[in-house]
Amino acid sequence: MESTLSASNMQDPSSSPLEKCLGSANGNGDLDSEEGSSLEETGFNWGEYLEETGASAAPHTSFKHVEISIQSNFQPGMKLEVANKNNPDTYWVATIITTCGQLLLLRYCGYGEDRRADFWCDVVIADLHPVGWCTQNNKVLMPPDAIKEKYTDWTEFLIRDLTGSRTAPANLLEGPLRGKGPIDLITVGSLIELQDSQNPFQYWIVSVIENVGGRLRLRYVGLEDTESYDQWLFYLDYRLRPVGWCQENKYRMDPPSEIYPLKMASEWKCTLEKSLIDAAKFPLPMEVFKDHADLRSHFFTVGMKLETVNMCEPFYISPASVTKVFNNHFFQVTIDDLRPEPSKLSMLCHADSLGILPVQWCLKNGVSLTPPKGYSGQDFDWADYHKQHGAQEAPPFCFRNTSFSRGFTKNMKLEAVNPRNPGELCVASVVSVKGRLMWLHLEGLQTPVPEVIVDVESMDIFPVGWCEANSYPLTAPHKTVSQKKRKIAVVQPEKQLPPTVPVKKIPHDLCLFPHLDTTGTVNGKYCCPQLFINHRCFSGPYLNKGRIAELPQSVGPGKCVLVLKEVLSMIINAAYKPGRVLRELQLVEDPHWNFQEETLKAKYRGKTYRAVVKIVRTSDQVANFCRRVCAKLECCPNLFSPVLISENCPENCSIHTKTKYTYYYGKRKKISKPPIGESNPDSGHPKPARRRKRRKSIFVQKKRRSSAVDFTAGSGEESEEEDADAMDDDTASEETGSELRDDQTDTSSAEVPSARPRRAVTLRSGSEPVRRPPPERTRRGRGAPAASSAEEGEKCPPTKPEGTEDTKQEEEERLVLESNPLEWTVTDVVRFIKLTDCAPLAKIFQEQDIDGQALLLLTLPTVQECMELKLGPAIKLCHQIERVKVAFYAQYAN
């Protein structure tokens, strides 16, 4: 029985038809990165692992295929047309000097070797076009002013400069492919032609099922209902060609022999016709194949002997023979088998196939050569073998350079494909390097395998962090130092905790931390104590108190990063706006922390948001980290901490407990409270506002949030409590109100309108019977009449004020909402903005997915920060937002 495989089976630039296998016999078990990978389950971290093992990561430059995959499709020397900086209505031809991702370094033609005017631009947002675009669109081509006098005839200069040059591809400068790299162009569903593993002149179309950083999971068309024959190949594999290539070269388009019996010939024909039509409709850009290496001619002849890595079991090197030559590019190599009924294993090779070696290579490099099956001697000897079989050795010049190691050395770490389970990538260690071959130890496998032999240019090996960068599971080692205890992030129900625990007051400048018993633990400094969710503590404006109460009372003990990541995930899910909390957590950092970056997710309204958050790694920083997070979320610093709070919180946060919304709706409660966890000797005694505190006042306004978000948390009593708390917070910033009025920077404040005196100049509502102050009066005291008028404006029907002109203007600005802003979609928000004098900003709302609830949360600082608006337009926009808020409270707050 003879089986034939492609030489790419041996992890070569032609990498191999490897089947994906995770939990299924055929090697195609599904991997759901959303459900969590082994990285998440074990909390494996490359940084800690390298630190604890004392190993180093293989250099990124050693992975040739990965380096190529992240290169831009734009090449130095390409020409394009770009808008002039000083005169954007005109354009000029520029040359690409270098690239960095989607950034291009350009130089206007005419500057020669002068680099002083070089400039960077982003392909996605810059005004770039292919050469010839200006002529087609009647645009003006004009050289920059700095070199305008350098030549008298610029037309002649351009003709001379552009002759023989390459223009940047139009499809990469315009349309959906703009700025995308080669691997980004390959999408799920893309169709490609795949060379048969047995016959170099036969192809069949495959569909891309997954694209993991250029590593493609491929499925033959016609086999959509089964994954048994799926293969994994890197997109640079020579066996992959654009659809139509086979026909152009007059090769056969037939399904492989192993799948042909699965369907009738007529069915295969219909499948092919449909695939060709689909491929013509959505062709794969040719830029995907621009880095494919051209195959050089080989010099092998039938009967030549060589040594080769066993393609089915890449753990051994065996004697082999050239058994067939197809043409000057392809030949067949078969592993020698001396048994009477040999089971021949063959592979398709080309001149640069990986894993084929000259005779005596193993002897020269001190590597064991596995004798052929049926060989009678004890130790294999090529001299005796030649005498017995009279074979000819393949001359050394037939092989590529066999001594190039690409910088790999012993004990380096990397990520590698499990040859018995090609859908699985593992942590791997370089055991030894011989010439251009490496022996890898794969860690963490359920069924251990011998050391895997791979070429240094294999496309089945990847640098440290590649899986994480591509959101793909990585099989971690079974026992790393940091994982000595497998009970990580144990979530304990409340009933398992003792009923009462002594409580000590936590000083604001100290972090109380339980004693860690690290007996028997090599890695105690990375062990986090039990963290408690003290749901009785004040939850602040971001978090839903009801959802907090539903969380388990404790998490841990376990590895610091994993425990804290679990706690932060729970906190995010307990938020009114998970995405907003995620954004706040991004800002928590300290230069003195020993941290690592972790990706956290927030799901809201069917969308998933991701952000990188810094999490401390060592136990001595956990308490400080918890307090910093709580401070950022404006909640009690003991909301989650290493200390269990049974009854009374040491921070006395009960004074901030959320009470009935109706209580504040009808009454004016004047208190001035500092943020929790910060000492303020004057707490509870409002002080007159002072001008020099304006900067601080803006910060306070930024930190206050609208109670509008609280309505999304649920209904009934809980919702009312959340609203009341938000309003209570608003009164705390009252002392800064008059400062802000002076420069009108609180236009966007998201406070409840009835909870503070309004600024009649810019925040007018049709229901507010407040007279506009005289123009020369820049400051207004916060007397009781102003406060009561604000309340009455919310509670009572509008009464006619004395100033009829002011009333008329207020009536004009009064907004009547047809629907509740809390229920507005992004489209509704965009539609509203377009009806205002801020219509040009509607695009920003569309791009940032701002719905009604998010709209009600916007404040002047957030508008300036997130929308990158100057003060004038920001105030103008915030005035419109304030109109919505006023109308919301007037129409829907009841």
From Swiss-Prot:
Bias (Basic and acidic residues): 769-778, 792-807
Feature: compositional bias, Polar residues: 1-17
UniProt-listed InterPro entries: Mbt, MBT_SFMBT2_rpt1, MBT_SFMBT2_rpt3, MBT_SFMBT2_rpt4, PcG_chromatin_remod_factors, SAM, SAM/pointed_sf, Scm-like-4MBT1/2_SAM
Region annotation Disordered: where it falls in the sequence: 1-39, 672-813
Comp. bias (Basic residues): 687-706
Residue span, SAM domain: 824-887
Key words, A-Z: Nucleus, Repeat, Repressor
Positions with biased composition (Acidic residues): 717-737
Subcellular location: Nucleus
A GO molecular function held by the record: transcription corepressor activity
Record GO biological process: negative regulation of DNA-templated transcription; negative regulation of gene expression
Function: Transcriptional repressor of HOXB13 gene.
Binding partners and assembly: Interacts with YY1. Interacts with methylated histones H3K9me2 and H4K20me2, but not with H3K4me2, nor H3K9Ac.
Entry protein name: Scm-like with four MBT domains protein 2
